[in-house]
Every structure is written in structure tokens, then in C-alpha cells.
């Protein structure tokens, strides 16, 4: 399912317009990204948590040439699945 399909499905179930739903989803995603970018964690109980994690500097390797490279420390966004989400997926499996 892509974003437009999600918008259509939510609009169908809630009877709100697709335009309103798109604004809400776009705003929600922007807020999550901006919040995680500042170092804060965003938790949606039962669904999961978004946060940025520190990645230490390390030595890497160019897969094409085999040359060793230095990879500097960085922050990467992560998502941890909530219990309700995990259990729902496992039940339908």
C-alpha cells in the first residue's frame, strides 16, 4: 500500500475528504521527522517508536575495490515495532 492508497482508505472509513487526510498524514510525517532529527523519540503506543541512534565511527570497505575506508560517526533513524503491531502481524502469519 502506498501513501495515496492509505489516504483513500482512511477517507473511506472516516468520511473525511482525501485532501484533509493528506494534510493530516503529511503533517504527521513531517512532525515525526523533525522531532527525531532534533534527537527526541516519538512513541505511538502499540504501533512503535521512532528515534535517532548514534553510529560510531568505523572502518569500512569499498565493495568494488576492496579499499579500506574510514566511515565517520553518524546518526541514523530507527523504528522499533510496538507489541500490538508485532502481535497483530504474527497472528495473521
From Swiss-Prot:
GO terms for cellular component: chloroplast
Gene3D superfamilies recorded: IHF-like DNA-binding proteins
GO MF annotations, alphabetized: DNA binding; structural constituent of chromatin
UniProt KW keywords: Chloroplast, DNA condensation, DNA-binding, Plastid
UniProt record, GO biological process: chromosome condensation
Keyword presence, Cytoplasm: no
Residue ranges that the Swiss-Prot or TrEMBL entry lists as coiled coil: none
Positions of transmembrane segments: none
Subcellular location: Plastid, Chloroplast
Domain of life: Eukaryota
InterPro entries (UniProt xref): Hist_DNA-bd, Histone-like_DNA-bd_CS, IHF-like_DNA-bd_dom_sf
SUPFAM superfamilies per UniProt: IHF-like DNA-binding proteins
SMART domains listed in its UniProt record: BHL (SM00411)
Pfam families associated with the record: Bac_DNA_binding
Keyword DNA-binding assigned: yes
Main subcellular localisation: plastid
Similarity comment: Belongs to the bacterial histone-like protein family.
Function: Histone-like DNA-binding protein which is capable of wrapping DNA to stabilize it, and thus to prevent its denaturation under extreme environmental conditions.
UniProt name for this protein: DNA-binding protein HU homolog
Organism: Guillardia theta (Cryptophyte)
Amino acid at each position: 500500500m502506498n501513501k495515496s492508497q492509505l489516504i483513500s482508505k482512511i477517507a473511506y472509513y472516516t468520511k473525511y475528504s482525501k485532501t484533509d487526510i493528506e494534510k493530516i498524514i503529511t503533517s504527521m510525517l513531517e512532525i515525526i521527522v523533525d522531532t527525531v532529527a532534533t534527537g527526541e523519540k516519538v512513541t505511538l503506543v502499540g504501533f512503535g517508536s521512532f528515534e535517532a541512534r548514534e553510529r560510531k565511527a568505523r572502518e569500512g570497505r569499498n565493495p568494488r575495490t576492496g579499499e579500506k575506508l574510514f566511515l565517520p560517526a553518524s546518526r541514523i533513524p530507527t523504528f522499533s515495532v510496538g507489541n500490538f503491531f508485532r502481535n497483530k502481524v504474527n497472528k495473521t502469519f
